[in-house]
Design a protein with these regions (language model features):
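Phosphate-handling DNA/RNA-contact segment within nucleic-acid enzymes
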Residues: 1-118, 135-136
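A charged alpha-helical hairpin associated with nucleic-acid processing machineries
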Residues: 28-29, 70-79, 106-122, 128-275
Length: 275
């Protein structure tokens, strides 16, 4: 049941899948325990271990902490997505209850659709190192297709070497929530992350910016947000909005985005795995 059954090792002997681990129950939105995460107490690998997937437990759908956050608030203003269930637990202990974590996977469309059932704003919280930024690009790409009017996606990056667990112990909940309040909106994150690589004041830089941002706009649903993104790109590149709309429409014939940052999850990551 929920992955607590014993397994056989290479010698054929039975053993407890989660032996010598701190257990974190993973609940669905109704509060039913559908899986577990286990954090090892020693230097044994892997550091984190999840229950195997079952008909009730799918990592690509479930969010650790969503049940608890939904119970704590009558109305959830926003949800902060962190990288591990230990982060969720420590933040809650320090008074920050609007946090959830994916279960060792990149955020999926299913995750985001579930989040937006309970709040209109999601804030991705990542470590400030290179791996964190690459994970943010992946979250950005996943978010584009569900950014309809009335929904908000933001990004916050912690100082390099810090994670939610360590930083809230240092600065406390009040200052941590100030960092949350200053999170970067998705539109600004797109332009800031791409513009940083090019001289957007030069013709070449403006051309490159257009080439990279247009495929991202194409992924967005029609609506006010998409229109405003085209307008913002027009101001930054001096291209007419009508021309940008034409170029966005042409992306229908392009099966692959021209913006493909080198996003990956480090093989030495401490994210949970199945076993």
């Amino acid at each position: 049941i929920v992955g607590l059954l014993i397994d056989r090792n290479e010698e054929g002997k039975l053993y407890d899948r989660f032996r010598n681990r701190i257990m974190f129950p993973i609940r669905d939105i109704r509060g039913r325990t559908i899986g577990f995460g286990g954090r090892v107490l020693s230097d044994e690998k892997p550091k984190y271990l999840n229950s195997p997937e079952t008909p009730l437990f799918h990592k690509g759908r479930e969010l650790y902490g969503l049940y608890e956050a939904n119970r704590h608030f009558r109305s959830i203003e926003n949800l902060i997505v962190v990288e591990g269930y230990m982060d969720v637990a420590v933040l809650a202990q320090n008074g920050v209850h609007n946090t959830v974590a994916t279960l060792g996977t990149a955020v999926t469309i299913e995750h985001l659709n579930k989040i937006f059932r309970y709040t209109s704003e999601v804030i991705f919280c990542f470590d400030g190192d290179e791996a964190g930024k690459k994970a943010a690009y992946r979250a950005l790409d996943t978010s584009l297709s569900i950014i309809v009017d009335g929904r908000s996606v933001k990004f916050m990056f912690l100082p390099e070497g810090e994670d939610p667990d360590t930083i809230i112990r240092k600065i406390g909940a009040k200052k941590f929530l100030e960092l949350v309040a200053n999170a970067t909106p998705l539109s600004e994150f797109i332009f800031e992350s791409i513009s940083a690589e090019y001289d957007h004041n030069s013709v070449d830089g403006k051309a490159k910016l257009s080439k990279l941002v247009i495929p991202l706009i194409h992924k967005m649903p029609s609506g006010v947000f998409r229109t405003l993104m085209i307008r913002a790109l027009s101001k930054k590149t001096d291209l007419e909005e009508s021309e940008l709309k034409r170029l966005v429409k042409l992306e229908n014939n392009n099966n692959q985005s021209t913006y493909t940052p080198n996003v990956y999850f480090d093989e030495n990551s401490e994210q949970p795995i199945d076993h």
